[in-house]
């Protein structure tokens, strides 16, 4: 591992941090250390990192802004690549937008709305990066990334870089091919938006932001929606009807504001959260006969 660290530093791939606590990089404020954390400063840095990872036969994981993640208390084995400053380029040409995978989604939706571009209003309250949003087909307010993405530039595990069209992304509810069938890193996304009326777009954005502020506990560390909605039900409704609102294990609590959110009240461990998730799953199955599936991504040792 020491030799790999030295080569990464010599290759100037970006910031190289050893045994770095990942709680600093997630909105849940939970997570043990990454053996090696890379914050690349350019695409070439990511490519070189993957070359070295392959050379040393080391496991690797990619994270964005950590908004939909629960990282193990034991951390993550191998190399963790965090997308951010090195992939935050933006190009707007009429209604076509090309943006780096590390660009903040809320910042992008706000900027484009002020330019009178419609289609990304649903993302006005979704924390995280563009790359993470494409990876999981993030959405809200009856819309999602699949409605606006035309193609995405992907760096695959074998080091090849290629564009995947909308059809090739295999989008479904909170899912894309990048999660299982074709693992890779979203370097860039191209969105097709619509030219609209600036005042109306900004108004919708504000309405969405206000709704989130009033109904979701973003004033506490959390990871967004914990469960996918089990059609035709809403996960939060089932959890609240089961009487679990406010239930707490350790420092992790089912939000009083929204049943599908688990908040870190202070000092929560990943195990606290996992115990709550298991309790919710079993309770909902026993009471309503419904299987619950997590939307939050659970990673690590």
UniProtKB/Swiss-Prot annotation:
Main location: cytoplasm
Reaction(s) catalysed by this chain's protein: UDP-N-acetyl-alpha-D-muramate + NADP(+) = UDP-N-acetyl-3-O-(1-carboxyvinyl)-alpha-D-glucosamine + NADPH + H(+)
Keywords: Cell cycle, Cell division, Cell shape, Cell wall biogenesis/degradation, Cytoplasm, FAD, Flavoprotein, NADP, Oxidoreductase, Peptidoglycan synthesis
Top EC class for this record: oxidoreductase
Gene Ontology BP terms: cell division; cell wall organization; peptidoglycan biosynthetic process; regulation of cell shape
Transmembrane domains' residue ranges: none
Family matches, as PROSITE patterns: FAD_PCMH
InterPro entries: FAD-bd_PCMH, FAD-bd_PCMH-like_sf, FAD-bd_PCMH_sub1, FAD-bd_PCMH_sub2, MurB, MurB_C, MurB_C_sf, Oxid_FAD_bind_N
A Pfam family it matches: MurB_C
Active-site residue numbers: 174, 225 (proton donor), 295
One MF annotation (Gene Ontology) recorded for this entry: UDP-N-acetylmuramate dehydrogenase activity
Domain FAD-binding PCMH-type: 29-196
Metabolic or biological pathway: Cell wall biogenesis; peptidoglycan biosynthesis
PANTHER family per the UniProt record, alphabetical: UDP-N-ACETYLENOLPYRUVOYLGLUCOSAMINE REDUCTASE
HAMAP family the record matches: MurB
Job of this protein: Cell wall formation.
Membership in a protein family: Belongs to the MurB family.
Full protein name: UDP-N-acetylenolpyruvoylglucosamine reductase 1
Organism lineage string: Bacteria, Bacillati, Bacillota, Bacilli, Bacillales
């Amino acid at each position: 591992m020491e030799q790999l660290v030295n080569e990464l530093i010599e290759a100037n791939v970006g910031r190289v941090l050893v045994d770095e606590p990942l709680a600093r990089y997630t909105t849940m404020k939970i997570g043990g250390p990454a053996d090696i954390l890379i914050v690349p400063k350019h695409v070439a840095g990511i490519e070189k990192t993957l070359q070295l990872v392959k050379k040393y036969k080391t496991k690797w994981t990619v994270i964005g802004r950590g908004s939909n993640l629960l990282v193990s208390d034991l951390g993550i084995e191998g190399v963790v690549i965090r997308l951010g400053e090195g992939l935050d380029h933006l190009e707007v040409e009429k209604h076509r937008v090309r943006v780096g995978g590390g660009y903040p989604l809320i910042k992008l939706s706000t900027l484009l709305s002020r330019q009178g571009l419609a289609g990304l209003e649903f993302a006005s309250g979704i924390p995280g990066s563009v790359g993470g949003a494409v990876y999981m087909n993030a959405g809200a307010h009856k819309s999602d990334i699949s409605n606006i993405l035309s193609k995405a530039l992907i760096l695959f595990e074998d080091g090849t870089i290629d564009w995947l069209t909308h059809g090739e992304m295999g989008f479904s509810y909170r899912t894309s091919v990048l999660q299982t069938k074709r693992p890779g890193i979203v370097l860039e996304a191209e969105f097709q938006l619509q030219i609209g009326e600036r005042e109306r777009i900004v108004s919708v954005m504000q309405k969405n932001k206000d709704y989130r502020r009033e109904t979701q506990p973003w004033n506490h560390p959390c990871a967004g929606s914990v469960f996918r909605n089990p059609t035709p039900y809403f996960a939060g409704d089932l959890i609240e009807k089961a009487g679990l609102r406010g239930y707490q294990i350790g420092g992790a609590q089912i939000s009083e504001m929204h049943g599908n959110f688990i908040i870190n009240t202070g000092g929560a461990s990943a195990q606290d959260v996992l115990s709550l998730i298991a309790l919710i799953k079993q309770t909902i199955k026993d009471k309503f006969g419904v299987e619950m599936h997590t939307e939050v991504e659970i990673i690590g040792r």
